[in-house]
A protein has these predicted regions:
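A short SAM/SAH-binding and catalytic strip from SAM-dependent methyltransferases
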Residues: 139-151
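Short alpha-helix
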Residues: 205-223
Length: 265
């Protein structure tokens, strides 16, 4: 990413996140994530994150632990305030948290609330230029972050480089649509909403912002990655979203699958 675009993205991202009420002064707020948002500002969103995490913890990680042993070496890409890395560390794994956002409340510097109790490495870097050796990780986890990539092919090429043989990439809480047209409509709606609320569309990074079925098929072929789709249960209200959208003649809503991409060969 060009330095000017990166700086604009980070400045606008910090504004959005602060206005949304993310982060806190108290360590207790961080230690409760993802199960409770003690501020109440984004309680519904953290409910979704908690269900995704529980599914990963109970249904996906144990299988890889049986295959590779504990600790699993896991890259947490787009780590934000590092809550996923902390949860992974408490399970006995060896995470590395990576992000370009270093804010003290919502970025990498918020890791101090965790590393004082459970140390793990924190790295300021981009998805497409990971400063780690080939074959470093058993797993790469994108927690609500894969869609910030500006080029999925470039990002996955770097992910494949740092994965060990039989490693896997896990994509959580990234919006998935049936078609790219549905995803593009969402992006345009988000830009208009941000322009109205914050005064800018927040598109300096040119993030893709969504996945669709055709793109998943193309990434499978290009990178020899076999995707398994996991569908956590997010409750009846979430389940009813497609029907509600159809009745109101709105675009189809996104799906929040957990995608596990295992490297073949």
């Amino acid at each position: 990413m060009l330095a000017s675009a990166r700086q604009q993205f980070l400045s606008e991202y910090a504004t959005v996140r602060a206005r949304e009420g993310r982060g806190a002064d108290e360590a207790a707020w961080y230690h409760e994530l993802p199960y409770r948002d003690l501020s109440g500002a984004l309680a519904h969103q953290w409910t979704i994150r908690a269900r995704s995490w529980r599914y990963l913890e109970r249904r996906i990680l144990p299988d890889f632990a049986r295959r590779h042993g504990v600790p699993l070496h896991i890259l947490d890409l787009g780590a934000g305030n590092c809550w996923v890395s902390w949860r992974l560390a408490t399970l006995g794994h060896a995470p590395v948290a990576l992000d370009i956002f270093t804010d003290s409340r919502d970025g990498l510097r918020a890791s101090r609330h965790y590393t004082a109790h459970m140390p793990f490495p924190v790295v300021e870097a981009e998805f497409d230029a990971i400063p780690l050796p080939d074959g470093f990780a058993d797993l790469v986890v994108f927690n609500a972050s894969f869609h910030y990539a500006s080029n999925y092919e470039r990002t996955l090429a770097e992910v494949r480089r740092v994965l060990r043989p039989q490693g896997a990439v896990i994509v959580m809480d990234t919006p998935v649509y049936k078609t790219s047209e549905e995803g593009r409509r969402m992006v345009e709606e988000r830009k208009r909403r941000y322009q109205e609320r914050f005064g800018f569309p927040s598109d300096a990074q040119q993030s893709v912002e969504f996945l669709d079925r055709k793109t998943l098929t193309e990434l499978t072929r290009q990178f020899q990655i076999r995707w398994t789709i996991h569908r956590p249960w997010y409750g009846w209200q979430w389940h009813a979203r497609p029907a509600v959208a159809w009745l109101r003649r709105r675009r189809p809503p996104s799906r929040f699958w957990i995608l596990v991409g295992e490297v073949l060969g």
